[in-house]
Amino acid sequence: MAILTLGVNHTTAPVSIRERLAFPAEQLQSALRDLIDLPQVGEAAILSTCNRTEVYCELDGRDQRPIVDWMCDQRQFDDQDISQYLYSHFDAGTIRHMFRVACGLDSMILGEPQILGQMKTAYQAAREAGTVGKILTKLFHRTFAAAKKVRTDTAIGCSPVSVAFAAIRLAQRIFDDLGDLTAILVGAGETIELTARHLTENRIGHLIIANRTFDRAHTLANQFGGFAISLEELPKHLAKADIIVASTGSPLPILGKGSFESALRSRRHKPMFIVDLAVPRDIEPEVEQLQDVYLYTVDDLQHTVEENLKTRQEAALQAEEIIDLEVEHFLSWLRAQAATETIRDVRRQAELHRDAALQRALRELRRGKSAEDTLRWLADTLTNKIIHAPSSQIWQAGVNERADIVAAARELFQLKDPDT
């Protein structure tokens, strides 16, 4: 048995690769079922965010090739096109990696909290698909507990640092004052909600939220004093936008070059600041060719987030120490599973001997045999049944000069050293 992580993230693959490897929410269930159908896979979960796609599997063996082939087939990749971007971890490496990811230590912005919620969503999706069992369920729960401990015991999450926060910081560098500006947020998930909060805290003039589900946009707009529209209405409102932040789960771009050309004419080429946080992208890359447009993707934000690293280095070191302990705790549990199964089998075998002997003893009592004789027979029978197999194995170990087995048996049965 092995536990595998296989995936890509913002450090190993550009956005053009990550967007092709992303699994939209509506495709997760079928993808998980296809994955669990592989004969090598016992349990599986998929984490798919803007910055990473990772597959977690409990495998029979350590061959990751079937998982790579499955990923290529799912996302229409040739092996040579994807292998250079993939990373993998096994067992302790997987445990440590998942703990670090959940704590935000592997994120574009060190310590960002959103990833923990995304991992919980990934686990819930796998539960609903019926693809997680004892091992991954325990691992996810320990991952969540480790992340909680890190955030409680260190300062890793004290300041509001996230991709959304970095986007607003970038906007503040381009515009002196947000108070006279209009921002359109496309989507209504956690990233957009966080962006809306940061914009409101920085006193944005007007806020418009566009979403495929109007009710969700309306709820979010009410929360932050904004105005809700549907995605169908977005093109006619585009000219109002000084700032656009997009983060949906759409498999195809929502806004193209033509929409922005029209908006810029209406704005008389007043600049537009656009941040596309979605993977796959919500905004066609060709929009960047337009004058008076400042288009940034999640990859571009890397330069901004580097400024946040210095203040979190000490907290990150403390977090790594906590993770070291948590990894060892989980490994201890994992190592104990083989012993647990053996203990269960030994107990089951002993109970079978007990039940058989007890039934015979009860029959003898009903036939009038004395209780004392029956109890003596029962005690002798149980003793012989229980020690027969280990006694035979110990004797055979002596014949084969396996002193290690004999010594292990003395330790197992807590026998005193014969020389003392």
Swiss-Prot record:
One of its GO terms (biological process) is protoporphyrinogen IX biosynthetic process from glutamate. GO terms for molecular function: glutamyl-tRNA reductase activity; NADP binding. Pathway: Porphyrin-containing compound metabolism; protoporphyrin-IX biosynthesis; 5-aminolevulinate from L-glutamyl-tRNA(Glu): step 1/2. The record marks 97 as: Important for activity. CDD domains: NAD_bind_Glutamyl_tRNA_reduct. NADP(+) binds at residues 187-192. Its EC number is 1.2.1.70. The active site is at 50 (nucleophile). It catalyses: (S)-4-amino-5-oxopentanoate + tRNA(Glu) + NADP(+) = L-glutamyl-tRNA(Glu) + NADPH + H(+). It is an enzyme of class 1 (oxidoreductase). InterPro entries: 4pyrrol_synth_GluRdtase, 4pyrrol_synth_GluRdtase_dimer, 4pyrrol_synth_GluRdtase_N, GluRdtase_CS, GluRdtase_dimer_dom_sf, GluRdtase_N_sf, NAD(P)-bd_dom_sf, Shikm_DH/Glu-tRNA_Rdtase. It comes from the Bacteria. Keywords: NADP, Oxidoreductase, Porphyrin biosynthesis. Substrate binds at residues 49-52, 107, 112-114, 118. Catalyzes the NADPH-dependent reduction of glutamyl-tRNA(Glu) to glutamate 1-semialdehyde (GSA). Possesses an unusual extended V-shaped dimeric structure with each monomer consisting of three distinct domains arranged along a curved 'spinal' alpha-helix. The N-terminal catalytic domain specifically recognizes the glutamate moiety of the substrate. The second domain is the NADPH-binding domain, and the third C-terminal domain is responsible for dimerization. Homodimer. During catalysis, the active site Cys acts as a nucleophile attacking the alpha-carbonyl group of tRNA-bound glutamate with the formation of a thioester intermediate between enzyme and glutamate, and the concomitant release of tRNA(Glu). The thioester intermediate is finally reduced by direct hydride transfer from NADPH, to form the product GSA. Belongs to the glutamyl-tRNA reductase family. This is Glutamyl-tRNA reductase. It comes from Methylococcus capsulatus (strain ATCC 33009 / NCIMB 11132 / Bath). The gene is hemA.
